Amino acid sequence: PELGRYCADWPVAPRIVALAPARQVLLSSAHVPAGQQRYVKQALPFLIEEKLAEDIEDVHIAMGPVAREQPVPVAVVRHLEIIAWLDALYTAGLPPASLIPEPLALPWREGQISVAIAGDCCLIRAGQWRGLGCDRDNVLTALSTLARQCQDDGGAAPAIAIYCPEEEEPAAWGRCLQQQHAAADYAGEVAVHEREGGPLAVLGPQLVGEAPADRIDLLQGGYGSDRSAGARRFNWR
């Protein structure tokens, strides 16, 4: 609420970008049959239903750009989750212009896996549209699995970039991962980036300015915003 009141005093309303918790969002993709791109919105629920643990009626599906002969990137979240987030944001006086899954706010480049150590939860981005959240006890295993998957898909061994605050002993994380790589005869490089501040020190820079092409905004469909005349009225209620 305090932040909402602070923003209300600005002469120009700020553009608010909210982050959706990684563990509550499934980032996946769907292969659309040739010639069916125009019907992709209608087809998506049927194309990804087998990947879900929930009933398709209980989830919201947001999609990324549709490219010819390419899988369609999607983000899936339970309706109950996104409604709770929007309720909290509006109650605090912070109507969001965008709602982005946390992993897609990590810095990333081709041939790299990025991971941010943030307390008990770690964020991983393993591709333009791939990412997840996991607990810190499983992050090294998850990184090794994702790196091997990249190689199995025909790519080179990806470099791994670790973003870690000083109190998390970044050098120790780097050594553990390098030892694991050596034991598995893995050739990918490991780079450790010590950062100050919380997770937003890593995620924040990617959220500034216009939304790049490698984000999926969850505010689509029934959760989309009416931005006409500067309005931020959401239709999800």
Feature map (PLM): residue ranges:
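Hydrophobic/aromatic-enriched cytosolic interaction surfaces used to assemble or bind macromolecules
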Residues: 1-237
